[in-house]
């Protein structure tokens, strides 16, 4: 991994990525799983690089009585060719994960854009709203026509308290 990529990976606050980007649980857990597998692979690579890769066959010949075994092992090691592994299946899995992550990211982008539009419309409504002191009874009747019938019914029945008001807001009367 390049120094730039390593520095960029260390600069990211991975704990807050999911909450800041509002990722769904599946995407967040997939990222966490990928990060843990990557950390394990980097640790394993570090331990393997620290190990010695050369074998001193002269030492084994001097210690062991059966020198033919040492000669066979040495010839086997010299003729050893590492097996080339076909990485296509793993690359396909990585590409599938990347496609799924991209699709999830696009959905998240659309959700965020829709939420931003909704919030900006709400903010515009709040900024353009009239102060409550300027709202008249006629404005209330026009906005909610059934309020006039409700008030007339309450007045004819002699009810001056809105049902449920005291339970919700408490009794503010002095007496």
From Swiss-Prot:
GO CC field: matrix side of mitochondrial inner membrane; mitochondrion; proton-transporting ATP synthase complex
Q: What is its main location?
A: mitochondrion
Lineage: superkingdom: Eukaryota
Residues with N-acetylserine modification? 2
Spell out the Pfam families in the cross-references.
Mt_ATP-synt_D
Query: What InterPro entries does UniProt report for this protein, alphabetically?
Result: ATP_synth_F0_dsu_mt (IPR008689), ATP_synth_F0_dsu_sf_mt (IPR036228)
Protein's cellular compartments: Mitochondrion inner membrane
Q: Does the keyword Transmembrane helix apply?
A: no
Sorted alphabetically, the Gene Ontology BP terms of this entry are:
proton motive force-driven ATP synthesis; proton motive force-driven mitochondrial ATP synthesis
> What would be an example GO MF term here?
proton transmembrane transporter activity
Q: Which UniProt keywords apply?
A: Acetylation, ATP synthesis, CF(0), Hydrogen ion transport, Ion transport, Membrane, Mitochondrion, Mitochondrion inner membrane, Transport
Membrane topology qualifier: Peripheral membrane protein
Entry's family note: Belongs to the ATPase d subunit family.
What is this protein's function? Answer: Mitochondrial membrane ATP synthase (F(1)F(0) ATP synthase or Complex V) produces ATP from ADP in the presence of a proton gradient across the membrane which is generated by electron transport complexes of the respiratory chain. F-type ATPases consist of two structural domains, F(1) - containing the extramembraneous catalytic core, and F(0) - containing the membrane proton channel, linked together by a central stalk and a peripheral stalk. During catalysis, ATP synthesis in the catalytic domain of F(1) is coupled via a rotary mechanism of the central stalk subunits to proton translocation.
Q: What is this protein called?
A: ATP synthase subunit d, mitochondrial
Organism of this sequence: Schizosaccharomyces pombe (strain 972 / ATCC 24843)
- Gene responsible for this protein: atp7
């Amino acid at each position: 991994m390049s120094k730039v990529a390593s520095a960029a990976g260390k600069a990211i606050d991975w704990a807050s990525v999911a909450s800041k980007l509002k990722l769904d649980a599946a995407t967040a857990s997939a990222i966490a799983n990928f990060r843990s597998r990557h950390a394990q692979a980097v640790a394993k690579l570090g331990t393997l690089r620290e190990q010695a890769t050369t074998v001193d066959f002269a030492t084994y010949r001097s210690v062991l009585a059966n020198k033919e075994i040492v000669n066979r092992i040495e010839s086997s090691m010299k003729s050893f060719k590492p097996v080339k592994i076909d990485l296509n299946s793993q690359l396909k899995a990585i590409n599938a994960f990347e496609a799924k992550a991209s699709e999830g990211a696009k959905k998240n982008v659309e959700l965020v854009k829709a939420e931003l539009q909704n919030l900006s419309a709400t903010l515009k409504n709040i900024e353009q709203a009239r102060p409550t002191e300027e709202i008249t009874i006629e404005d209330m009747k026009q906005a909610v026509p059934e309020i006039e019938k409700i008030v007339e019914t309450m007045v004819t029945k002699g009810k001056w308290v809105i049902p449920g008001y005291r339970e919700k807001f408490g009794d503010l009367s002095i007496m």
